[in-house]
Amino acid sequence: MPELPEVETSRKGISPHLINKSVQNVVLRHTQLRWKIPQDLLSDIKDKILLSIDRRAKYLLFNFTSGTLLIHLGMSGSLRICPLNSPPKKHDHADLIFADCLLRYTDPRRFGAILWLGLTPEDSPLLNKLGPEPLNDDFNAKYLYQQATKRKLPVKQFIMDQKVVTGVGNIYATEALFNSGISPIRAAGNISEKRYQILVTEIKEILQQAIKQGGTTLKDFVGSDGKPGYFQQTLQVYGKTGQQCPSCETPLKAVKLAARASVYCPECQS
């Protein structure tokens, strides 16, 4: 699933091609994604200027003069800039057509979303309960420690809760916990503010490095230029159950938390 770095990579890749341009047409080949694409989407954005593209958590927000379009990449989605009249492939479900290029939405598993939020996107139930962005200053050790008070939830699930902090998915939570020396199964409320400071620093550093490297491509994700990300080459423990810990050579273990495998070192993480 594309996580925050992959979504931010997409945003940075497509923005220079589309900002301050107007949509000429919309082509919908398959409208049933996670939710059905609005049939009147064309009337909402045709001839409207795209002012900016923002990211909130794992959502992309296309801010037009007429309102905001939300795009979510789901489990396997991607956005690409293509020349006009580029022939679509099997999983290319939607195109936003501009004067000199088109934005193509591809989603093999069709678990993403294209939704019109109108002029008050902040009122959307998808956005109005999200926690702070992990790269912003309001996501800090004091905040995380306060949120964790008396919480018995494993810390891995805690930092993946979108109401606590947005956009920290399985890959980057696993890596940040390893770098912090914190076991994913330790209760969130049983971690000191000092250790949360280490964890917050690692989360920010890992996300920033992943963005610089174009995200992580494990299966489906490609950037707006069709190229994969390269952060997977620096992963230390994610997806490496049974391999040696890069620090102490102890075999890495995996535990299932909320239906997701979490790989960790039983010696280095406590």
From Swiss-Prot:
It catalyses: Hydrolysis of DNA containing ring-opened 7-methylguanine residues, releasing 2,6-diamino-4-hydroxy-5-(N-methyl)formamidopyrimidine; 2'-deoxyribonucleotide-(2'-deoxyribose 5'-phosphate)-2'-deoxyribonucleotide-DNA = a 3'-end 2'-deoxyribonucleotide-(2,3-dehydro-2,3-deoxyribose 5'-phosphate)-DNA + a 5'-end 5'-phospho-2'-deoxyribonucleoside-DNA + H(+). It comes from the Bacteria. GO terms for biological process: base-excision repair. DNA binds at residues 91, 109, 151. InterPro entries: DNA_glyclase/AP_lyase_DNA-bd, Formamido-pyr_DNA_Glyclase, FPG_cat, MutM-like_N-ter, Ribosomal_uS13-like_H2TH, Znf_DNA_glyclase/AP_lyase, Znf_FPG/IleRS. Keywords: DNA damage, DNA repair, DNA-binding, Glycosidase, Hydrolase, Lyase, Metal-binding, Multifunctional enzyme, Zinc, Zinc-finger. A zinc finger (FPG-type) spans 236-270. Its EC number is 3.2.2.23, 4.2.99.18. The active site is at residues 2-3, 58, 260. Belongs to the FPG family. Involved in base excision repair of DNA damaged by oxidation or by mutagenic agents. Acts as a DNA glycosylase that recognizes and removes damaged bases. Has a preference for oxidized purines, such as 7,8-dihydro-8-oxoguanine (8-oxoG). Has AP (apurinic/apyrimidinic) lyase activity and introduces nicks in the DNA strand. Cleaves the DNA backbone by beta-delta elimination to generate a single-strand break at the site of the removed base with both 3'- and 5'-phosphates. This is Formamidopyrimidine-DNA glycosylase. It comes from Psychromonas ingrahamii (strain DSM 17664 / CCUG 51855 / 37). The lineage of its organism: Bacteria, Pseudomonadati, Pseudomonadota, Gammaproteobacteria, Alteromonadales. The gene is mutM.
